[in-house]
Amino acid sequence: MKATALLIAVFILFSVFGDMGYCEFCDTPHCTRVCYDHCVRLNKHYKTCCMTNINDRIRMECLCEDKTGIKPYYPNNI
């Protein structure tokens, strides 16, 4: 019963907010350079870069890795 309620809640959340936070892979030299520099500045290893469209605003998301795992970081100087 609880599992069914949880699945329904997750489905509703993805239905309403599904397009928010979708990150499209970006492998252009600009994306790579900005994210690589951003990860190095944070003392982390660069993994990849993607672009997120939230409410018609494009935002770059850098995926950096350290010993705790891979996490997203958002550079301000795009």
From Swiss-Prot:
It comes from the Eukaryota. One of its GO terms (cellular component) is extracellular region. Disulfide bonds: none annotated. Keywords: Disulfide bond, Secreted, Signal. It is found in: Secreted. Residues 1-23 form the signal peptide. Expressed by the venom gland. Contains 4 disulfide bonds. The keyword Secreted applies. This is Toxin-like protein 10.
